[in-house]
Amino acid sequence: MRRDRERRIYKLFVTRNSEYLMRGDVCVGVRDRRSGTWSIDHEAVTQVVATMVHRQGERVRMHSFTPRVGSALYFARGPVLTSSVRAVRRPDRATYDDWRRAIDSLPVAAE
């Protein structure tokens, strides 16, 4: 039951090539949609979303970080601009558990 409650604070932003797992406005993991592999060292991981960007032809409009299909995520540090978001959903249990396994397999840094 605890894992289900914890999962609710996460959102999965799906783009053409990647899935961005967000905890609030912080990216905690990026998964390649083709291979299903989590990239914990992706440029967006640990970054806060600065804004969302919506392209309308030549015009670009920025708006606050609210889940919107059709807009792109913009991470200022890096910078990283994703392709358009195709879907936003709560990660299912398998996705969340797969991400946790990827995190848990990382070597612990020496202090």
Which residues fall in each region the model found?
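Low-complexity intrinsically disordered segments
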Residues: 36-111
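A short acidic-Thr-Gly-centered motif at the start of a beta-strand
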Residues: 1-6
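An extracellular/secretory-lumen and virion-surface interaction module
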Residues: 16, 26-28, 34-35
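Broad, structure-driven detector of short, well-ordered beta-strand segments within folded domains
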Residues: 20-24
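A short beta-strand micro-motif
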Residues: 10-15
